[in-house]
């Protein structure tokens, strides 16, 4: 799979998601036709390969900069505490009351999307 990606981090992320269901982190968001693809695990694997091999051999990716931040639940917590992102009042209440936020739910997708979006905007500055 690594060889098939032709030294492309983005291609390897997509191949991992295509060929291995455990890397297919995507959900339909509020009725949209195309799923939102976060692909956190696939991106972490690619970033780990790059780091472990110090950008050489199996870690030689010409587009490693295409990998986004890894959108899990911790990053939005930290960004919110720093004032970088805010939650809608209903979501803020649900978090404060420690309610479960199901995987693939609208709230989960909003949290993860906000985290990626805020860091992408920060990186462009």
Give residue spans per PLM region:
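HhH-family (HhH-GPD) DNA N-glycosylase catalytic core used in base-excision repair
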Residues: 1-125
